[in-house]
Amino acid sequence: MRMRVFASTVLIAIAAAAQEQPPAESSFPQPNAAGANNQAFSDPSALFGGGSGATIGLAVQNIQSEGSYAATVVNADFTLGPVGLGVAVPLNLMVWNNDQCCAGGYTRESKTYLGILRKRDWDEPQDFSKFVRYLRYGNKRDPLYVLAGQLWGSSIGHGTLVSRYSNTLSLDHPKAGLALDVNTDFVGVETLTDWVGNPTLMAGRAYLRPFGDMPILRGWAIGVSGAMDRTAPYNVTGPLAQDPQGNPIVPNTRPVYAMGVDTEFELLRNALISLIPYTDFNRIAGAGNGIHVGVLTDLRLPVPLIEMSVQTKFEYRMMQPGYIPEYFDQLYDLGRVQYAVPQGSGTAYVAKYDAAVAARNGDTSFSQRGYYGELALNFGGFIQVGGLYQDRDGDPTGASLGVYASVPKFETIKLSGYYLRKNMSGFSDAFRLDERSLLAASMAYKVWGPVYFRADFRREWVLAPGETQIRAVDSFTAGMATYIPF
């Protein structure tokens, strides 16, 4: 009995010491895995983000197989305290038409209005949402956080169900989403909607900190998560049909539900390190269950002359065969319709929910194991690099790889980019560009005064006129622009 009392006293003393000198940037422990790294795979073209200013210029944009356009580079960011607003005027004026593309849409007239303005940029009401890139209040983990518009890397909870979801990957169909979070010492809520006009994906998490006002135990939280695709495709077979705007016509849809419970405890929190182990139990209805056990680390290194930080996430997974971790991921808008699965010596594409149900095959045991690792390095904000890797035993296409880098603070040159490869068979398959690869990069080189040479590369998805499969298209933009801070 005395030994138990002594051991308890020592543990409490250690925990109390670990909680001293909390980091100044937030009064709340980080409730989720991606809280600090959501922007790791964000818009690389936002090279001058973080303050108020405008970029004005003209460039030439080449869209793979389609043609070349004179493109406006008109973006402005306004920041006032916690409020941020980003606007744009994105116009593509055809310069050269590739008359070999596409089946059902070869001519300049079929691709443009008046032979000039790209038609698929402005043939749906939601296209006008491109004028407002984002409207933001606060930052992730603030007491109140609101983000409306483009979602580049939005997660819910520890990111085990909804991880870095993006609504920006379609070339022709932009969406204005909404993320809204409320965080207090005792309770909090995270929400996510992919498109405020006609939402498909809706997700949320509510968490409770029973001892939110106690110095030692305040780091313990329990949460409940849920996500739903209201119109998930299923029984998708054969070629895809499309409407006049290029949206796939899916005859069979149904709601798909996913839910989970989680708990975490912040073991360490001081000026140098934050350490949070967590456990999630998730279920995808009709497909399978999964258990995630992980740890989040945020380490601040006292390096002379520069503030250096290291963030890591390591996770071990136990899964039923039909369970797909991070089901609503960065490529979900593509995968819900066209998801890669192995077939013989090749690859077939089915709806993601069909793939999950087929993989279950009546097996309810947690027979499959997997792991996830993520590392991010920040050298005083001047250089930011990182990567992630995950794999799954028993799944020949269960691996994923991601890398990113950003050099945002140098005046002469600014660089940003990322690469993500999903559903690959291993490292030998890691750098193949196809419908499972996501690549984006941007550069700004200072020529003179406020004048910069700009170059942007984007890999997006399109269901081209007359085609029956969604495919990746690459667009490259290069031109001159002026950045005016205000």
Task: Tell me the role of every PLM-derived stretch.
Residues 10-18:
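Hydrophobic h-region of N-terminal signal peptides that target proteins for export
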